[in-house]
Amino acid sequence: MFNFKRKRKIDVTGSTVKTLDWTNVSLSQYIELQDLVLENEDELEQEDIMLQEIQILYKVDPLSLDLQTFKKYVESLKFMKKEIPKMKIKDKYNLGGNIYYLHKKLEQFKVGQYIDYQRIMQTKKGIETYPEFLALFITTEEDGTYGDGYDVAQVITDIRKYMSIADATSIAAFFLKSCKLYTALSILSSMWRTRKVIKDRKTRKQLRKKTMHLINLVLNGE
């Protein structure tokens, strides 16, 4: 007995099977796929999960498909066994018809961005953070400033709904690494400024040890 729930607003017939890969699966679809497995791993049979995957990715009602068409959809899911590819990071992205610009220079980071970055990293984990995290570096104008003259919530929505998981993971990996390095360099710079005013050799040594431990935590989480 299938434990399958139909969703609203889907193509009932699904006669045309589109070719999908990770470059045209949206971030929201990937999050939904991930939640499907994590939340129902012990409750759903593999067949139920497969039906849900077809519905999420193709927005069709799999139970209404003829057997020949259903077989094509099942075959089309093979790409999910492959790794998500690393994509070249672009300067601008078209998300649902809206053009957004990516800002890669962390030295232009504003206090508001850093506060939001810390909040996101402390309150959320994993792929669910990506829409908010990526919105820190994306604006509606080429020379725009974070949150200035546009709705950040709309950017987050467009990233979640329209950015491919391949683009999202590639951009996130770049900025997560960059943010860690930038934070580590800031800590190191602060240590050297502090060391200059500390005369006691033992205290300076302890400061250096604590600083290097903190940098290791930032870079490696250890």
Feature annotation, model-predicted:
Residues 1-222:
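Charged interaction scaffolds used for protein-protein
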